[in-house]
């Protein structure tokens, strides 16, 4: 049995063992350390002060920010023990130690050691030993993992020596620590970045950004930024508390002061100048990463928050993960029994289920050939997959550009039946039949999606609040009458913020149940908002907006319809 030290530190505490990965952002309350992911078996459990074991993290790149906030708030786990290589929470713990002096030990255990430690009641971590207490006690030596020193260019050494300023030097230190953990042989140039940590999900995001900005940080590559937590132009009319709005604006201003483009969108693939196939980029935001790799054929790992900024400040990234050809090959094959006459709800359903079945490997999806998905369908499958898996991409046979890559020799094969899809639909529909809010735009809605919604409403006025979050560029493109039609129908078009960053009172406070077409928000929404969620197609959402009633299980998933 083996266990190795990834980040140093000592600690002890009762064990919280998970067999399913967890997204720290959207899955853990940063103020208490309680698990809030309603879909996770550990929901309601406290992580603070406990030795937390899990195979890997999953989902959001923003988990690093949550991990840092937990450390700053004094409610972090006593230690983290992973069974597999993990970047997101590890990066948050690295920043907590390196920048703020709040270390959280991170360890990796081999399969047998992980299983044995998971059965312990409590664990103690010393400088060189891990000791598990309980009915089946175990003591293991802690080894140092092989961490080859990456080769540095003269430019890398100059940045590290401070020739580009203290912020870039700190950024290079972080990059090199991660490069060693990822066993990267060298750093590579990247052409563009997308920074994720612009949402005021916690004070750690603001503290980190303002600290780097105060050090004179400036990005070296074109860098867009994610959605923020307020509509910058209209927050006062929306009743947002000035203190919160001011902090959200400060966070956005810190990034723009560092030279980032004020794009304020979680869908950077809807901006102009898309990345090209094979282009080495450095994006964070899980849905954007999965879309860039899967649909565009660009190359970017799922960079954790804060590492994304460090890369933007240097233009350099560790040569690891899906930057490499071998890491893009399928490690899992899913045969989908695609229903006849399925609507657009199929794609987020498949993405959600694919992530659960392939939590840490790039999957190849077969059985969807000939369905001719739209870019909105592909956006939906990528967003849902990026929520339930740690993998940064997937392949769809006959659809995506690298689906021809041969699966790895030991790639497992799974059949996904229509009953599996029906059960996935049920798992995302825990809310009541009556809904009092319709949520569109997670990720940010496209021009096509807004036009479809206007057409589905067909001049009728909504009976429950209906909000579409999207980017400023999309709203500017809706001058063909779509924006006016949605406004007349009573639909709110909100720029800058997104559903994953929306808070009361912009999120209507009296809401009890929400209808959405987003597999991502159907998963995260209960934990983020405290409300029940219903999921369906865009047509289902339009009908819910007009009637206040959520749709039932669609006909194309009903067993009686399939056997008729």
Where are these regions (language model features)?
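N-terminal basic/disordered segments at the start of proteins
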Residues: 1-21, 132-215, 300-301, 311-316, ...
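Feature captures the catalytic cores and cofactor-binding loops of soluble hydro-lyases/lyases
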Residues: 3-127, 229, 449-528
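Histidine-anchored nucleotide/phosphate-binding helix
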Residues: 65-72, 205-212, 219-221, 346-354, ...
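Short internal beta-strands
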Residues: 78-84, 220-223, 265, 364-366, ...
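A generic, well-ordered mixed alpha/beta core segment in the N-terminal half of proteins
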Residues: 85, 91-111, 121-124, 130-131, ...
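Mobile "lid/hinge" segments at catalytic clefts and subdomain interfaces of large enzymes
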Residues: 276-370, 508, 522-564
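Acidic, glycine-rich loop-and-beta core segments that form the ion-binding/anion-interacting portion
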Residues: 363-429
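Glycine-rich phosphate/ribose-binding loops and adjacent secondary-structure elements
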Residues: 408-498, 531-536, 552, 563
């Amino acid at each position: 049995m083996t266990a190795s030290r990834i980040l140093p530190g000592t600690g002890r505490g009762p064990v919280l063992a998970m067999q399913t990965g967890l997204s720290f952002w959207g899955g853990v309350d940063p103020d208490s350390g309680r698990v809030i992911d309603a879909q996770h078996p550990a929901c309601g459990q406290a992580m603070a002060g406990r030795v937390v074991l899990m195979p890997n993290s999953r989902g959001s790149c923003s988990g690093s920010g949550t991990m840092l906030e937990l450390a700053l708030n004094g409610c972090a786990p006593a230690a983290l023990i992973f069974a597999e290589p993990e970047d997101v929470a590890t990066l948050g713990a690295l920043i907590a130690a390196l920048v703020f002096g709040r270390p959280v030990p991170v360890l990796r255990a081999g399969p047998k050691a992980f299983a044995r430690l998971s059965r312990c009641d409590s664990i103690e971590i010393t400088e060189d030993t891990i000791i598990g207490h309980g009915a089946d006690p175990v003591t293991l030596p802690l080894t140092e993992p092989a961490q080859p020193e990456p080769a540095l260019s003269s430019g890398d050494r100059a940045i590290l020596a401070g020739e580009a300023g203290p912020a870039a030097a700190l950024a290079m230190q972080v990059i090199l620590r991660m490069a060693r953990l990822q066993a990267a042989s060298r750093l590579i140039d990247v052409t563009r970045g997308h920074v994720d940590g612009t949402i005021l999900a916690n004070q750690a995001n603001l503290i980190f950004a303002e600290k780097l900005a105060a050090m004179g940080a400036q990005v070296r590559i074109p860098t867009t930024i994610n959605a923020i937590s307020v509509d910058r132009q209209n927050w006062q009319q929306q009743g947002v508390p000035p203190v919160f709005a001011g902090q959200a604006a400060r966070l956005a201003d810190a990034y723009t002061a560092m030279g980032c483009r004020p794009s304020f969108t979680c869908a950077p693939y809807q901006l102009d100048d898309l990345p090209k196939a094979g282009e080495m980029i450095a994006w964070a935001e899980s849905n954007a990463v999965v879309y860039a790799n899967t649909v565009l054929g660009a190359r970017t790992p799922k960079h954790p928050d804060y590492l994304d900024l460090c890369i933007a400040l240097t233009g350099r990234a560790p040569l690891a993960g899906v930057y490499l050809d071998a890491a893009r090959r399928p490690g899992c094959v899913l045969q989908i029994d695609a229903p006849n006459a399925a609507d657009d709800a199929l794609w987020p359903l498949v993405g959600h289920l694919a992530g659960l079945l392939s939590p840490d490997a790039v999957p190849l999806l077969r059985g969807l050939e000939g369905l001719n998905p739209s870019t909105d369908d592909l956006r939906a499958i990528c967003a849902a997959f990026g929520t339930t898996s740690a993998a940064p991409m997937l392949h769809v046979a006959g659809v995506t550009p690298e689906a021809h890559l041969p699966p790895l020799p030991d790639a497992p094969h799974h059949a996904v039946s229509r009953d599996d899809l029906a059960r996935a639909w049920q798992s995302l529909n825990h809310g009541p039949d009556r809904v009092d809010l319709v949520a569109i735009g997670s990720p940010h809605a496209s021009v096509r999606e807004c036009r479809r919604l206007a057409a589905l409403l067909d001049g009728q006025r909504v009976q429950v609040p209906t909000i579409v979050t999207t980017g400023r560029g999309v709203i500017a493109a809706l001058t063909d009458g779509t924006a006016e039609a949605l406004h007349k129908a009573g639909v709110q078009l909100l720029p800058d913020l997104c559903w994953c960053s929306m808070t009361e009172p912009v999120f209507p406070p009296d809401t009890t149940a929400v209808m959405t077409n987003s597999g991502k928000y159907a998963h995260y929404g209960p934990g983020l908002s405290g409300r029940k969620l219903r999921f369906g197609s865009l047509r289902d959402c339009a009908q819910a907006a007009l009637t206040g009633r959520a749709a039932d299980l669609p006909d194309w998933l009903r067993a009686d319809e399939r056997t008729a």
